[in-house]
């Protein structure tokens, strides 16, 4: 009889909570539910294989666009005791409501990367452009309205070793601008973070680089794709103790944004016991097991064929591990002394050469203004494949500092470094024409009647200076990256970055929201109870 009463109680609580999921926010170095209970991720990577797509020429499959598929997978997530998924690429133009609702009803939160395979900050030739900013904000717009949207990832393993640390400045600029966009758009303060590889030389300086500086610039959380624990390892020999000690001074939440070594099969996921133990939870807030779908890399825990799902050997191990761990309950109201902290940016060294001066916020209005006032421009029939030869020739003859983007310390960013390739080529061709009086380039360019710069456009050009190496301070509304924006009509509702510097430390509570505790006893009970049922952190006290 007691079991029957408990079953009814569970069903009632789950039914009551099904209609609403408590948004999760960041306060200092931890995630919290709205009621102040600490949140831990028991997650899994969720990105379908392109080979499984029915659409010819598909670059990636949006895992949040197929409501039937999401509903199909929810019971398996529940069997795994998963409370979060990570998706790596979404199509912002598609409808995500069915999937997000299915996951919300199941108490599952979503962590989404902002990039996609062919729209991302490059490791080898990093830039932060109008087009990339537009892509990232479109993803924000498509997912931010949902209460179970846990956070956005501005880059995944962009910095791979000490040879391309310059790329970090561009990722951090993306973090800054997406955070500003979320705020100016009136969304709740959804965290924006970065996910890195576990590279020995850059591991420490990279983490502190993304954590340091002004609240507006640094990440809200930091993830490491970590595969150090293989087979039946332990807290010490796996390297987990070292990693935990290394990051004990981080001021933002730390997660394993991927984990699950496959060197020993089957994977028993014994690292989960350590990750959610008191040895690690002071620093770490859970993680994302890699991965749900089986693929050629053999990390999956299920195979999918149409509506049919078959669990693989690793599935029950992951399920039992997640179900068995319940971290010690902790609350925002009792942790206030540990939440406020600052992180000053460190000096560069041979392992870390990223500039603390960040690229400016991309502005389409500035680019259109500049381009409309050029007299010597590239012909429309010239293929973009031929642009590189023209850039090479012109930039060997005159300075191209106005379009330069260099994230190596101390950082150098031309006024038009974020414009598209055609606009940048128009700029340097016109500069060459002004210096040498030639605008032919073997028939590739032509003279046109340039527009006169007036009003706001004139102020942009003046701020850039004759060499176009000055930062252009501007304000822009939340549609500053829209393809329909214009320099003459741009409104002024938020301040954009203009080659900002991260030289000073600051509080890391930019993404926090004040918690007033539980709004009622019943809501607090439901959220706390569900956190145990679906993989959260608290223990239900009655």
Curated annotation (Swiss-Prot):
GO-annotated biological processes: cell morphogenesis; cell wall (1->3)-beta-D-glucan metabolic process; division septum assembly; establishment or maintenance of cell polarity; fungal-type cell wall (1->3)-beta-D-glucan biosynthetic process; fungal-type cell wall assembly; fungal-type cell wall organization
Spans annotated as Disordered: 490-515
InterPro entries in the record: Glucanosyltransferase, Glycoside_hydrolase_SF, X8
Residues where (1,3-beta-D-glucosyl)n 1 binds: 88, 156, 290
GO function terms (MF aspect): 1,3-beta-glucanosyltransferase activity
Cited Pfam families: Glyco_hydro_72 (PF03198), X8 (PF07983)
Protein location: Secreted, Cell wall; Membrane
Sugar attachment sites: 35, 91, 161, 249, 279, 406, 484, 502, 509
Active site residues of this protein: 157, 258
Alphabetical keyword list: Cell wall, Cell wall biogenesis/degradation, Disulfide bond, Glycoprotein, GPI-anchor, Lipoprotein, Membrane, Secreted, Signal, Transferase
The EC number(s) this enzyme carries: 2.4.1.-
Disulfide bridge map: 70-99, 212-345, 230-261, 367-419, 376-439, 395-400
Role, per record: Splits internally a 1,3-beta-glucan molecule and transfers the newly generated reducing end (the donor) to the non-reducing end of another 1,3-beta-glucan molecule (the acceptor) forming a 1,3-beta linkage, resulting in the elongation of 1,3-beta-glucan chains in the cell wall.
Family under the similarity heading: Belongs to the glycosyl hydrolase 72 family.
Protein name per UniProt: 1,3-beta-glucanosyltransferase gas1
The organism's taxonomic lineage, starting at the top: Eukaryota, Fungi, Dikarya, Ascomycota, Taphrinomycotina
């Amino acid at each position: 009889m007691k079991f029957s009463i408990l079953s009814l109680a569970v069903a009632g609580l789950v039914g009551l909570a099904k209609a609403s999921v408590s948004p999760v926010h960041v306060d200092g170095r931890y995630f919290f539910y709205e009621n102040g209970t600490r949140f831990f991720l028991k997650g899994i990577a969720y990105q379908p294989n392109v080979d499984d797509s029915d659409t010819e020429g598909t670059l990636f499959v949006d895992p949040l666009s197929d409501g039937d598929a999401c509903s199909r997978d929810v019971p398996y997530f529940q069997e795994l005791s998963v409370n979060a998924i990570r998706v790596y690429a979404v199509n912002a133009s598609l409808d995500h409501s069915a999937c997000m609702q299915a996951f919300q009803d199941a108490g599952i939160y979503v962590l989404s990367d902002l990039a996609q395979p062919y729209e991302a900050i490059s490791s080898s030739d990093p830039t932060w452009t109008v087009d990339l900013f537009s892509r990232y904000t479109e993803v924000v717009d498509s997912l931010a309205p949902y209460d179970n949207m846990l956070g956005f990832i501005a880059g995944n393993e962009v910095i791979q070793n000490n040879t391309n640390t310059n790329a970090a400045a561009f990722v951090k600029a993306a973090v800054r601008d997406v955070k500003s966009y979320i705020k100016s758009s009136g969304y709740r303060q959804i965290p924006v973070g970065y996910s890195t590889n576990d590279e020995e030389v850059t591991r420490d300086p990279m983490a502190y680089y993304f954590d340091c500086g002004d609240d507006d610039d640094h990440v809200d959380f930091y993830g490491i794709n970590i595969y150090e624990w293989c087979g039946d390892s332990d807290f010490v020999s796996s390297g987990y103790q070292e990693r935990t000690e290394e990051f004990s001074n981080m001021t933002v939440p730390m997660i394993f944004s991927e984990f699950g070594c496959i060197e020993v099969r089957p994977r028993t996921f014994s690292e989960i016991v350590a990750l959610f133990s008191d040895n690690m939870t002071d620093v770490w807030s859970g993680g994302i097991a890699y991965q749900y779908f089986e693929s050629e890399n053999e990390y999956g825990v299920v195979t999918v064929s149409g509506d049919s799902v078959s669990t693989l050997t690793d599935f029950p191990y992951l399920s039992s591990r997640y179900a068995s761990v319940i971290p010690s309950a902790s609350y925002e109201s009792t942790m206030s002394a540990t939440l406020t902290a600052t992180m000053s940016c460190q000096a560069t060294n041979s392992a870390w050469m990223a500039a603390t001066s960040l690229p400016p916020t991309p502005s389409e209005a500035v680019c259109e203004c500049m381009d409309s006032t050029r007299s010597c421009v590239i012909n429309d029939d010239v293929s973009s494949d031929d642009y590189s030869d023209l850039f090479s020739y012109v930039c060997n003859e005159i300075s191209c500092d106005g379009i330069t983007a260099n994230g190596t310390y101390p950082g150098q960013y031309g006024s038009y470094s974020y414009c598209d390739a055609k606009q940048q080529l128009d700029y340097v061709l016109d500069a060459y024409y002004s210096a040498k009086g030639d605008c032919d380039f073997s028939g590739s360019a032509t003279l046109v009647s340039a527009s006169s710069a007036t009003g706001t456009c004139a102020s942009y050009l003046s701020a850039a200076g004759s060499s176009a190496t000055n930062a252009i301070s501007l304000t822009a509304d939340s549609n500053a990256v829209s393809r329909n924006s214009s320099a003459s009509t741009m409104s002024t509702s938020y301040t954009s970055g203009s080659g900002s510097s991260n030289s000073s430390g600051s509080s890391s509570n930019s993404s926090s929201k004040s918690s007033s505790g539980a709004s009622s006893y019943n809501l607090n009970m439901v959220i706390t109870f569900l956190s145990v049922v679906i993989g959260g952190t608290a223990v239900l006290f009655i």
